[in-house]
Amino acid sequence: MKNIFLHSLNLENYRNFKNLELKIDNIPIILTGENGSGKTNILEAISLFYPGRGLRSSKLTDICKTSEDYCRVKALLQSKLGIADFSTHIKRNSNRRITEYNASKIANNELSKFTSMVWLTPQMEGIFTSSSTDRRKFLDRIVYNFDTKHAELLNKYEYYMHERNKILAEDIRDNNWLKIIEENMANISNIIANNRLKTIRFMQQAIDEIENEFPKADLSIDGIIEQKILNVEEDIVSFIITELYQTRSKDKLLGRTSFGIHKSDFLVKHQKKNILAKFCSTGEQKAILIAIILAEMNSTIKLTKITPILLLDEIFVHLDDKRRQYLMDFFTALNIQLWVTATNLDGIENFANKAQLIKL
């Protein structure tokens, strides 16, 4: 079993922090402090060492401390490839983020080769009533823990889709290049769709096997390509190539690609009630989301033999005693580095006795 965890974390000019240095152990860490003290900012800084834009999906210019030209996050991290120095650096005027692994630049989408991470924030509780784009990104972030190349594939797909849209918009008469682009999109789409379906299968198995204090969910993906894979209807790659070819005129008028894996939606149902999570109460939605995160942790550890870093922002708020106790027991048994934010320790005193407390 490989444990992914931080040994140290340094923030410079990061949001409300001028300088912050933390030395931590591979145990649960509880960040306490008043609202506005920067607890979630620390979780966000850690999440930057995983593919994407962090747990807030913030603009880079919002991350730097007001009036400062740059910000930097450094971490000494026990990674999949051993202990290593990681850093990410943002210059306000360039609106670019540079990430380094042992002083060598790496692409953001390469981070899943080194780290494994799961997080849950209050903002995510609206995921079921949000856009299909948000749900799809949520699913893809889960996939990163099972396939380290998934983020890179998504970036390549976006690149080829942008190129296709550009060729169609500018009426470039280069059918050979367009054909190559659509073939690349089709091949990548097939892999991405299969990755998503495989991950949903892993997650569903974990949900069905585990009895806990949270409602069980049925997971599925609503997408033409994924559905054809499930039905084993035909040569998927050829089907995608044909669809892209046949929608060229339509897409030229629309100015976008109207067909593809970027249109799929991640669907979640309350298993017992047999209704989509978006129709459940807000309390039920939060409980279902927690159940999905627990399944993600269990399936990731079981199938990859890697324990991710877990980031939880105010997770214990509005939970009843039974569910709160279940989570504390679950986290303790996992033997992972867990970061939890809380304004105070009310109701989690016993859990706090086994954790590293950091008061801001």
Curated annotation (Swiss-Prot):
Localization annotation: Cytoplasm
Alphabetical UniProt keywords: ATP-binding, Cytoplasm, DNA damage, DNA repair, DNA replication, DNA-binding, Nucleotide-binding, SOS response
Keyword Cytoplasm: yes
GO-annotated molecular function: ATP binding; single-stranded DNA binding
Source superkingdom: Bacteria
Record GO biological process: DNA replication; DNA synthesis involved in DNA repair; double-strand break repair; SOS response
Annotated residues for binding of ATP: G33, E34, N35, G36, S37, G38, K39, T40
Entry annotated with the keyword ATP-binding: yes
A single GO cellular-component term on record: cytoplasm
Pfam entry (one): SMC_N
Annotated function: The RecF protein is involved in DNA metabolism; it is required for DNA replication and normal SOS inducibility. RecF binds preferentially to single-stranded, linear DNA. It also seems to bind ATP.
Entries under PANTHER family matching the protein: DNA REPLICATION AND REPAIR PROTEIN RECF (PTHR32182:SF0)
HAMAP family: RecF
Protein family (similarity comment): Belongs to the RecF family.
Name of the protein in its database record: DNA replication and repair protein RecF
Top-level taxonomy: Bacteria, Pseudomonadati, Pseudomonadota, Alphaproteobacteria, Rickettsiales
